[in-house]
Regions:
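Conserved glycine-rich cofactor-binding loop
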Residues: 9, 16-18
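Residue(s) in the substrate-gating loop at a strand-loop-helix junction
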Residues: 142
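Alpha-helical segment proximal to the catalytic Tyr-Lys
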Residues: 127, 171-175, 232
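Short, small/polar-rich loop/turn modules that mediate ligand/substrate recognition or access, typified
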Residues: 174, 179, 234-236, 242
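Substrate-binding pocket helix/loop in short-chain dehydrogenase/reductase
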Residues: 98-99, 103-111, 193, 204
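Active-site helix of classical SDR
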Residues: 122, 158, 166
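Conserved glycine-rich Rossmann-like NAD(P)H-binding loop of the short-chain dehydrogenase/reductase
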Residues: 30-46
């Protein structure tokens, strides 16, 4: 435990598990007040309970970033909390399919959540940051947004769009003391990867120079750095964390 972020309020979307949870915990352990979101009330309540158990400052709240009404309700729910100094746009979904078989809803749902969702959340948080002349926005993209991947045209388009969003917004708000960066994880060890067969797991490792999957905490550490004063001269960048899987 430390107090590096004791005066900061951090908003992390999609924080009930995996990378989002690791990011939320990393900031909470360093003294930040963390608003961590989940799509269900059960998961949000579990986040709140875990925070209490660990003596963290913060709360879990329900939010569906794909639903404007949910975002509006969330905005109302956080009115009595301090405005977020640090926003981590992590929430996202996949609906994989080959393009020729992809249904309209598979395309639209992924774009609406993974790309339009960060527009909604950033717009919600940006005005207080502008007034304070300080802010950190970190968008969780993906190696797929850089390298592409068969069966993921929707996901790849959304994550590549997120990188363009990051660069353009960085140019808009840099003069107000706000930095905007993206992190592009490769294959990260999660509950889903734990369920992969040994054959599939080994085939993944063949494409990773370091010969292992990444850990969620390794992504959280990069996000934590980008939010720190040590990264105050870094903006509009995409940091790849993929073990050498992609070196573009």
């Amino acid at each position: 435990m430390s107090d590096i972020y004791k005066d900061k309020t951090v908003l992390v979307t999609g924080a009930s598990r995996g990378i989002g949870k690791a990011i939320a915990y990393k900031f909470a352990k360093q003294g930040a007040y963390v608003i961590a979101t989940a799509t269900t009330e059960k998961s949000a309540n579990q986040i709140s309970a875990d925070f209490v158990k660990n003596n963290f400052l913060g709360t879990g709240l329900v939010l569906n970033i794909a639903d404007k009404l949910s975002v509006d309700k969330f905005e109302n729910n956080i009115k009595n909390l301090n405005s977020a100094n640090i926003l981590v746009n992590n929430a996202g979904i996949t609906k994989d399919n080959l393009l020729m078989r992809m249904k309209d809803y598979e395309w639209e749902d992924v774009i609406n959540t993974n790309l339009s969702g960060i527009f909604r959340m950033t717009k919600l948080c940006i005005r207080p940051m502008m007034k304070a002349k300080y802010g950190r926005i970190i968008n969780i993209s993906s190696v797929v947004g850089l390298a592409g991947n068969a069966g993921q045209t929707n996901y790849s388009a959304a994550k590549a769009g997120m990188i363009g969003f990051t660069r353009s917004l960085a140019k808009e708000v840099g003069s107000r003391g706000i930095t905007v960066n993206a992190v592009a994880p490769g294959f990260i060890k999660t509950d889903m990867t734990d369920e992969l067969s040994e054959e599939i797991h080994n085939s993944l490792l063949e494409h990773i120079t370091l010969g292992r999957l990444g850990e969620a905490d390794e992504i959280a550490s990069v996000v934590n750095f980008l939010a720190s004063d040590n990264a105050s001269y870094i903006t509009g960048q995409t940091v790849s964390v993929n073990g050498g899987m992609y070196m573009g």
